[in-house]
Amino acid sequence: MDLQNPAAAWRRRDALRILAACMADWWLPRNLFAQKSSVPRKRDRRVIVVTFGGGVRYEDTLARDGWVNIPHLASDIVPQGLVYPSARHEGLTGHFNSTGALVTGSRQNVDAYGSEAPVTPTIFELFRKEHSLPPEEAWLIATNKSFGLMGGSKLRAFGDPYSANVVLPKQLLISTIKAAVSTNSGPGVEDRKALAERMMLALDEGYEGFGWRVFESDRVLSADLKASLAKSLLDYFNDPASPTSGDELTFFMAKEIMNRFAPSLLVVNFWDIDIAHYGAYSLYLEAIRRTDRLVHELWQHVQASPKYRDRTTLLVVPEMGRDSDVAGNGFANHRSGDESCRRVWLVAVGAGVPKGAGTERPIRTLDVAPTVAQLLGFKMAECEGRPLAELT
């Protein structure tokens, strides 16, 4: 035990006890020795869904040898919440269709590069329509630039009037800096050449290149709001001390949206992990650790905000896995459809979540959307998934 910090030692011991069950044949029965957090009224409830976008293998994260890559989840978040180690992704293992299944509760089969919207209603549309909510109540902040149409389906009774506000921070920054460096020097862009070079270095860290087409929904941000968000992003980017990976930009924008609007429904897509396609295992693990840190910092931001503290449920889930070394192409890909591509996990923490608990009950990523519906008090009867009883 750490005699200088006994509380930290006990937290580590608790985390090891809980996570060790992921390697055993048993798990804590639901609610056994678990104390649920207080549950706010539905109208006061807030839900944040965060994806380990790009896909991560179970063995590199929640398996015992993977804990070193998710130290904050393992030591800081899991002991406060509930973990499902036996989650499964069903359906296609591309990014758009995988995350599409998360936000609709139904398997999707549309263009993998984001030129088509989901074919079934999203949580954003159903939430806003049933409660007659303004667009400021539902947001999607995504590192993946192909997610421009993820905020809503094209169904006649839903679609753009009820879809989420979608912000792609990397793309917003690209367009902002391109506009800035094409004008005369001014505040924030004194050295246009240096700014452009820094943009190229920072924004080319991810797997997708500048040539990828970005598809935009007809539900667009107002010019004033877009300009205001772009100014904040540019100010952040201009600070030499600011980290500038795609996920760092997404994290900054998520906090900005939370501070300005305090939306009831927020989905955050981190995606630096997909750098694994380059075949560098060290970069893949570095991105996992970055995502783990950003999830923890986001949860700390929730706890520091009076509008979110004690009324927010955070759900953290990989959008899918990645190939195994034996049956697939290894960590670098996610197209084999083998079990390593499909086995994932889910961690929940916050309002209404049992503390320090877990269940070996198999669940599906399709269950995330109807669980969000139950938490926020709207109907989602037509999807394939089912609400997670432990959380609702």
Language-model features, listed with the residues they occupy:
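N-terminal secretory signal peptides
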Residues: M1-W10
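N-terminal export leaders
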Residues: W10-L28, L32
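Active-site-proximal N-terminal segment of extracellular/periplasmic enzymes that hydrolyze or transfer
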Residues: W26-Q80
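Metal-dependent active-site segment of extracytoplasmic phospho-/sulfohydrolases and closely related
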Residues: V47-V49, L283, R290-A332, V372
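Active-site His/acidic residue clusters
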Residues: Y58, R64, G152-K154, A227-N238, ...
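Short, structured active-site-proximal loop/turn typified by the sulfatase FGly-forming signature C/S-X-P-X-R
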Residues: D60-H95, E137-W139, T359
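Substrate-binding rim/cap in mid-to-C-terminal beta-strand-loop elements of soluble/periplasmic
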Residues: N97-T104, N333-L376
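Non-catalytic, well-ordered alpha-helical segments in soluble enzyme domains
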Residues: F124-K129, R361-A389
